[in-house]
Amino acid sequence: MPPRKRCDTVFGMAHPWWVNLLIVVPFTSYLFWRREPVLITRAHLLASALFAASFGMVEGTVVVYLRAVLAAAAGYGASVFAVAQFSRNFNPAMLQSAVLPISLLRVEVCREAATMLMLITVAHLGAHSRRGRWAIFLWTFAIWDLTYYVTLCTTIRWPSSLTAADVLFLIPIPWISPVWFPLLVSTLCIAAVLHSRRSILGHGVTDA
């Protein structure tokens, strides 16, 4: 795989350039919902939040194991302490070098695809309308993402700063950005869904 440009953690630019467009998703979704509020009950929000938080912890744990493989290959060892030390020196370019065998990289791509399918399935089951399903998807994705980083922080003390570079996704090519970027997008997505739900309660919809 040819080397790719690292993200500029000083200015917060993600790569490829179109990854930066994710910041508009919560804003455009909120404007879309203002025209016609989505119908999501408290029970659906709670159930999907519990799923997302649990799944985020599983996702974070899997990444700890993946980094243990990378740490062992780089000579750090495979203990939690070694993984934490390796993570402090983690560079997204490591995923594009011989450190990670191409066979494992393909497995990781398949895992990411399965993750998206699971989140889409939960969104489909959690609402009946397209608006509602989109809201549930953003809600679960955001909570999953935040819990993922909380899991990494509590287990291997990573990221050490919000400007640390991270690989967000590998499909179709690696998405690289500073950690603060996905945290901001996820927080805004949660805020957009919650604010829209307040609008729902104001429209006389029964909350259950």
What is each stretch, according to the model?
Residues 32-39, 195-205:
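Membrane-interface capping segments at transmembrane-helix boundaries
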Residues 32-46, 62-75:
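Membrane-interface helix-loop junction between the first two transmembrane segments
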Residues 37-53, 126-143, 205-208:
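Interfacial segments of alpha-helical transmembrane regions
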Residues 18-19, 43-47, 51, 111, ...:
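Alpha-helical transmembrane segments of integral membrane proteins
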Residues 20-30, 114-122, 177-196:
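Hydrophobic cores of alpha-helical transmembrane segments in multi-pass inner/ER membrane proteins
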Residues 56-69, 142-160:
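Transmembrane alpha-helix/helix-exit interface in multi-pass inner-membrane proteins
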Residues 8-24, 102-105:
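Hydrophobic transmembrane alpha-helical segments in integral membrane proteins
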Residues 63-109, 161-179, 183:
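Extracytosolic (periplasmic/ER-lumenal) interhelical loops and adjacent juxtamembrane/interface segments
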